[in-house]
A protein has these predicted regions:
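N-terminal pre-domain/capping segments
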Residues: 1-94, 129, 160-163, 187
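Acidic-and-aromatic substrate-binding clefts and catalytic sites of carbohydrate-active enzymes
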Residues: 5-12, 30-44, 107-115, 141-147, ...
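Active-site acidic/histidine proton-transfer and metal-coordination neighborhood
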Residues: 13-14, 68-163, 173
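A general structural detector for well-ordered alpha-helical segments in enzyme core domains, enriched
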Residues: 15-19, 41-48, 85-92, 117-124, ...
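Short acidic/polar active-site loop segments enriched in Thr and Asp
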Residues: 25, 55, 98-99, 190, ...
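Acidic/histidine-rich catalytic cores of soluble enzymes
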Residues: 26-27, 59, 123-213
Length: 229
């Protein structure tokens, strides 16, 4: 599939329409602001998806930058408030038919014990499950999750509730191997953001860099065949 973020800064509804009329059958929706979570707006997006027979697998929130403060500070009331706000995303996802919620989490500079991190993540995970949705941790280079060792600790603490989004460009930025991440986390990886990279940059169109995408897909098929890309 293709993310609406690929067409940023086009308005979300225009991005969805453009992808649909160009034959993209599967998309990820990147919400850019609060008004795009209103029921009438989301319902209109859902109508476009239905009209063109497009499925929406995942949703990416616009509030990632707030997650360190709202989920991982010492001020616990923030957690209750942010979980209540995130229900707006989950309600929107139910209308859209989306199943995966992409989570960035804490900044690596604001280190907290992994056990506490997992405790807070679990609150999000369980809230999402009330809506039939899976919250998945993305390997963002500037965040705690940019480290494969940290993600391994999440698996150790959370077991089957540790789900991940692998972003290949973020792995490059964190000096991690996408292949190693897949080999290590296996079917805990439920979604992949894939792009090419090489001398011209770390986020290129597929075919414009030197990344062995064929090998990545082979490993993905071996380790997590139900994963979406």
């Amino acid at each position: 599939g293709v993310s609406t973020a690929c067409l940023y800064p086009r308005l979300l509804e225009e991005s969805v329409y453009d992808l649909a009329v160009n034959g993209i059958n599967h998309i990820e929706i990147f919400v850019n602001t609060d008004s795009e979570l209103k029921k009438t707006y989301v319902s209109n997006i859902a109508d476009t998806l239905k009209r063109f027979e497009v499925s929406c697998r995942s949703l990416h929130p616009y509030t990632c930058a707030m997650e360190p403060m709202m989920f991982f500070s010492a001020y616990e009331r923030r957690i209750a408030d942010v979980l209540e706000y995130y229900k707006k995303y989950f309600n929107a996802m139910n209308i859209l038919g989306a199943e995966l919620f992409v989570f960035h989490g804490n900044k690596s500079l604001l280190q907290i014990p992994c056990e506490l991190y997992c405790e807070r993540f679990l609150k999000l995970y369980e809230t999402a499950r009330e809506f039939g949705i899976t919250a998945a941790q993305e390997n963002v280079s500037r965040c705690s999750s940019g480290s494969l060792s940290f993600m391994k600790e999440m698996v150790r603490n959370l077991g089957d509730k540790a789900k991940f989004v692998l972003d290949t460009k973020q792995a490059v930025r964190a000096n991690e191997s996408s292949f190693d991440i897949l080999r290590t986390l296996k079917n805990h990886v439920v979604h992949v953001h894939i792009s090419d990279h090489g001398e011209m940059g770390d986020c290129l169109q597929i075919g414009k860099g030197r990344f062995n995408i064929k090998r990545l897909l082979e490993i993905l098929w071996e380790e997590s065949p139900d994963c979406s890309v």
